[in-house]
Amino acid sequence: MRCPKCNYNKSSVVDSRQAEDGNTIRRRRECEKCHTRFTTFERLEELPLLVVKKDGTREQFSRDKILNGVVQSAQKRPVSSTDIENLISRIEQKVRANYENEVSSTAIGNLVMEELAELDEITYVRFASVYKSFKDVDEIEALLQQITNRVRGKKKSSIDDETH
């Protein structure tokens, strides 16, 4: 590894540990010539994953594209950037674990909606309203009814757990 200060190409690893995301190794290195310490990150190189859009075109999987959609949907909501980053990481892990070369944009959208439903219902509705391209109020009302039923089901099961 080349030293960022003197450009010497030999360094020794002083410390090595797994980074917070679990997919990266963080290494502290020391230049053998000028003794400058610097940090490097080692990450598994992943094969490119293509997203097949609804019109049949293909584009490279973009974590940032998902991030932008979720951030926009979560505006003025009590959702932290850490929550969003963790959500995006879970989605990317699921996509890479379940699809080798190609994944449909519909599958990604459904994964995002599943994750958002657990994170924040308003963010979920905002994302769904754009993703699903609702044609009328009845479709939005049906989505809200699904959420209401799911929330009631969770509350009922937690009450049942407390009484037993």
Swiss-Prot record:
A zinc finger (unnamed) spans 3-34. Its cofactor is Zn(2+). Residues 49-139 form the ATP-cone domain. Pfam families: ATP-cone (PF03477), Zn_ribbon_NrdR (PF22811). InterPro entries: ATP-cone_dom, NrdR-like_N, RNR_NrdR-like. Binds 1 zinc ion. The keyword Zinc-finger applies. GO terms for biological process: negative regulation of DNA-templated transcription. One of its GO terms (molecular function) is ATP binding. Keywords: ATP-binding, DNA-binding, Metal-binding, Nucleotide-binding, Repressor, Transcription, Transcription regulation, Zinc, Zinc-finger. Negatively regulates transcription of bacterial ribonucleotide reductase nrd genes and operons by binding to NrdR-boxes. Belongs to the NrdR family. PANTHER family: TRANSCRIPTIONAL REPRESSOR NRDR (PTHR30455:SF2). This is Transcriptional repressor NrdR. It comes from Streptococcus uberis (strain ATCC BAA-854 / 0140J).
